[in-house]
């Protein structure tokens, strides 16, 4: 296939649960990528976690051969992308390798905010977007309304959108036919010097770094010497190939194709995502425009439960960062938890997924502290600093201005749930920017503090709108706010890992709620445990976990009151002594209690 006109590179854009992984399964089945025995639901979601949660986390690539009605055989390079708002960067990376995208919309549910955002990313990158209506076999499918929504909300022509049902297989061949005609073939010269973009890479214990690349110009084969532009290092190619979805070696990868390169790179940072590869004989090749470095929105401390695991934890993080370029981390130490890392994530789901992957794939036991966003502080000396950890806040007297990050949140919601959504946004200190009625849905835009959005806004939004509202948000600016640091003291000692930054108006309520929650979670000891919430030197809430005590009077029967007093005093003195030397074990749930204050 030396001629590029036979190649089509595309990805699928869709909201969570609109059926993109099932559609991918149908494509693989129709093009004979796997035998009937190997076929299983959601073939591409290979991580256990992806299958359990039913979401796609990583982008996956597959090369299929499709014999079209015009008698030609087309090579389809298809990249599956995640739909959740936390994994938008995975989507933009996949789109950079394609010439077109299928916009899959559930014909019953209609357009959702997340697919709108990803669709704009695709259009900005100059991709041809082709709308597909999925789940047409459902009784509630309403294709005309949904076509209307696609045109009104996204603004692309949907009059001839293909209708199909990925589950039953209806109309899928029509989707492939249309795709071959609508999506343009890649451009590139096979005889030009090699120029390839790394879309994704992961670490294999046997093979070293495996990179998924899109070849723009030239060709690469086994035995070539490749140069990684950013590191300047040269590696020998061991094998190249494609996923069909099985790992299949090929003779070479040519311009326009998507496949993997293994060059026994042992250094984890040897082939960063977004980098350009070329042959060592042509080092002057231009660097391809990569992806913008994504900024984490949420920071949390991750600490190994046993300090002996620290080295393993560091290695695990390094390997995971290669596979997930948006994860950032730096070492941190806490008085309460010892040594660990402060990690940056894109959102709460991303944080949960990373923690679960670390615990499963690398067999670690971890404690996570409550997540926090990045604040900007202007000190009285005139300098501006950024703080991502509440325990690192300078003294209040030194701060002139406290600024919190504000995001612009776009929410699409059916009209009947609009009231609940507005109430929720106001409760989260949101300011309404505009509201548009689009068909049966309403699009509202709010400016909201990121702190409120990141923690549990998504879950609350889903529950108040019975799952119909969808959310997309992006960082807008920093804005002054009246914020304070809430410390938690246990038996008079500050626990740095439990500190959080809250708005002054909510401080007393949050303090009370937090101490109550901690009281339920900290197990009873042999002595009283005082839990206090404080702002600066002022205690705003307190609860006590009562001591467990033996009934020392059981052996007295009748007996004299002074005898009973003596025994009780003796017990009291013992408890007091114990309290001076006693340590309180704080369980993992207590660190995350901060998240669930409202529930």
Swiss-Prot record:
Required for accurate and efficient protein synthesis under certain stress conditions. May act as a fidelity factor of the translation reaction, by catalyzing a one-codon backward translocation of tRNAs on improperly translocated ribosomes. Back-translocation proceeds from a post-translocation (POST) complex to a pre-translocation (PRE) complex, thus giving elongation factor G a second chance to translocate the tRNAs correctly. Binds to ribosomes in a GTP-dependent manner. It catalyses: GTP + H2O = GDP + phosphate + H(+). One of its GO terms (molecular function) is ribosome binding. It is an enzyme of class 3 (hydrolase). It is found in: Cell inner membrane. NCBIfam families: lepA, small_GTP. Gene3D superfamilies: 3.30.70.240, Elongation factor 4, C-terminal domain, Elongation Factor G (Translational Gtpase), domain 3, P-loop containing nucleotide triphosphate hydrolases, Translation factors. GTP binds at residues 17-22, 134-137. Residues 5-187 form the tr-type G domain. It is a peripheral membrane protein. GO terms for biological process: positive regulation of translation. It comes from the Bacteria. Keywords: Cell inner membrane, Cell membrane, GTP-binding, Hydrolase, Membrane, Nucleotide-binding, Protein biosynthesis. Its main location: membrane. Its EC number is 3.6.5.n1. GO terms for cellular component: plasma membrane. This is Elongation factor 4. Belongs to the TRAFAC class translation factor GTPase superfamily. Classic translation factor GTPase family. LepA subfamily. SUPFAM superfamilies: EF-G C-terminal domain-like, P-loop containing nucleoside triphosphate hydrolases. Pfam families: EFG_C, GTP_EFTU, GTP_EFTU_D2, LepA_C.
